[in-house]
Amino acid sequence: MKDFKKINELCIGCRRCTEVCPGKIDIPGLIEELRVRAVKEQGLPFALKATFENVFANRKVFHSLLRLASIGQKPFQSGKLIRHLPLFLAGLAKDRSLPAIADKPLRDRFDKIARKLEKPAKRAAFFSGCTMDFVFPETGESVVKVLNDLNIEVVFPEEQSCCGKPVAALGDIETAGRIARRNVKAFEDAKADVIISACPTCTETFHDYGELLKDDPAWAERAKKLSAKVREFCSFVAEEYEKAGRLKKSKGGRKVTYHDSCHMRRVLGVHVQPRKLIESAEGCELVEMKDSDKCCGMSGIFGVKYADLSMPILKQKMDNIKATGAEICAVACSGCMVQIQGGLDKQAPGVKMKHIADLLAENIGKKK
């Protein structure tokens, strides 16, 4: 365990190993189990433990700190980006910009953007995740608009917080379990037909709540029941568009390339649907990039803590995007949005990053 602790953080979590291992060994599962054992035997560093237990597991504290950070970032902010940081932080923004925390998160905008539908076909509860709530709220608005356009009522449970992935990924399953219980309760109370997440990592985490809470049978059963309702945005919308006869290829126009999120493709198995949605968007022509399913190098904490390793991975992704000649790089993961938007701003400013929800929302009302 002592040797494992030295190397475990260098796993970027891309799950590429599951595709190349000839023995089909569940390497990600082994790493996750070893992380849990390491925490049980050796504990977490004090600062990390305090952050997980007192910030991530406490919605009000976590969200209050994010709101304060949106004020504190002002000296370094340029529009919606942070392009330069001082002193020892400078390396974080050398080859990529960082997204600024929004002045007004999605949860504060929701009541004004969600339409009241007379006879909705379904009731959806939207799990935004931290990044879409506080960094990319406009994309969260797009998700709501697309669902409303499908005659789906959307509600936003106020008590939702982080999905718990950053905590669980570092082996602190006790705190992750506390977070899971909070989210299960929040979404049970929403009484929705379906729960929509526009982040594949959050979707995967919700699906794993039953396993996470397996030692607490009552909560595990509740979590499994709830997890069965959780759908990833692109796969769900593609299904609904297909039913409505709206998943038809458009005449083309702007070149759009697509980056496959690691968790989207290799965990959820979703890769055809996002492409069909792009092709269905009026005025969009899909152009595939080389190695579209290779990691962008973000992987949450990894992309910040090991920026020197993350940047070469990002550069390869940027080179592949530029080679397509695309005007837009579409993504379907809020974590990848952080990395790719930042990389494009510094290395390919002529290319814009958009979540697929944004592309679809822009096309609402346009004739096919």
Model-derived features: where do they sit?
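N-terminal [4Fe-4S]-dependent radical SAM core
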Residues: 1-2, 111
